A protein has these predicted regions:
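Active-site helix/loop module of the DD-peptidase/beta-lactamase fold
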Residues: 4-44, 48, 67-69, 90-132, ...
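Cytochrome P450
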Residues: 77-80
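Well-ordered alpha-helical segments within folded domains of soluble proteins
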Residues: 83-89, 141-145
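Active-site Gly/Thr loop motif
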Residues: 116-141, 172-238
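Flexible, glycine-rich surface segments
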Residues: 145-177
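Short, gly/Ser/Thr-rich active-site loops of penicillin-recognizing serine hydrolases
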Residues: 179-183, 207, 246-271
């Protein structure tokens, strides 16, 4: 989505209704793109049960989201969830006139040489709408190219993929004055509380107390995927552990909340 912002008139402060007219007259129409990607939008975190998941495109996903009420005033609270990102993805599609998988391939995967990465794997069963929050199928080798680009402020192998301004915006505090309830990922995983826990699509794990800038960012997955970048230690990596069933094991270890142990261990080894 940042690549679309760089190339079109789509802006982080655009309301949903500017690009998706079906939201005009709906409370969700006034939500800003940056709120959708920072979990401060007020959109319900997930579809109610039983989830309707038999569509193949984001425009169909939007039809399921449109009737749902918001759960709080946009910008007033932080609540993690994936539905808002579906709306953001549809805004990007509207801005460039292409489906999300095509945008991903043309703007990121191809220039980053991510040859085995897709949001919509080829499958005759249907039901594979791009799930922006956790739906990327990739490999260690592919994803490390993406992390390298983010680490190098938007460049990869001498090619400009994202503007430095967009990368900075992604890593900036986007939660701002929104209420953060106790028990969020950063508090449980790191054993500390700080404001500005989230940017645009990424957690701000470790913060420089003097500047307020995040020097460690991440995007851990519930099933055991943990990509991170630590700018202070000049380290970035991607760890994958396949977890069957509950993320929390009988011995108390959680592949999700235990993720920062990996980044901390790697930094200690490198030092």
């Amino acid at each position: 989505i940042g690549a679309v912002v760089d190339r079109t008139s789509l802006d982080w402060d655009d309301p949903v209704e500017k690009w998706l007219p079906e939201f005009k007259g709906d409370a969700k129409g006034k939500i800003l793109l940056r709120q959708l990607l920072s979990h401060t939008s007020g959109v319900r975190p997930y579809l109610p049960e039983p989830r309707v998941d038999n569509y193949n495109h984001l425009d169909s996903a939007i039809i399921e989201i449109l009737p749902l009420d918001t759960v709080f005033t946009p910008g007033s609270r932080f609540q993690y969830g994936g539905l808002a990102m579906q709306i953001a993805g549809r805004m990007a599609e509207a801005a460039m006139g292409k489906e999300f998988e095509t945008l991903f391939q043309e703007l990121l995967a191809q220039p980053l040489e991510m040859k085995n990465s897709h949001f919509t794997p080829i499958n005759t069963d249907g039901g594979h709408a791009p799930m922006l929050g956790g739906g990327l199928c990739t490999t260690l080798n592919d994803y490390i190219h993406f992390l390298s680009m983010i680490y190098h402020e938007g460049t990869y192998e001498g090619k400009r993929i994202l503007t430095a301004e967009t990368v900075k915006e992604m890593q900036a505090n986007q939660v701002k004055d929104a209420l953060v309830s106790p028990g969020e990922y950063t508090e449980i995983a790191l054993g500390q509380s700080h404001t500005g826990i989230y940017g645009l699509g990424e957690w701000r794990e470790l913060i420089d107390k003097k500047t307020g800038e995040a020097y460690q960012i991440s995007s851990p997955g519930w099933a055991g995927a943990y990509p991170w970048i630590n700018k202070r230690d000049s380290v970035y990596g991607f760890f994958i552990a396949h977890v069957v069933g509950s993320s929390a094991k009988e011995d108390g270890f959680s592949s999700f909340y235990g993720s920062p142990v990996i980044s901390r261990t790697v930094s200690e080894i490198v030092k």
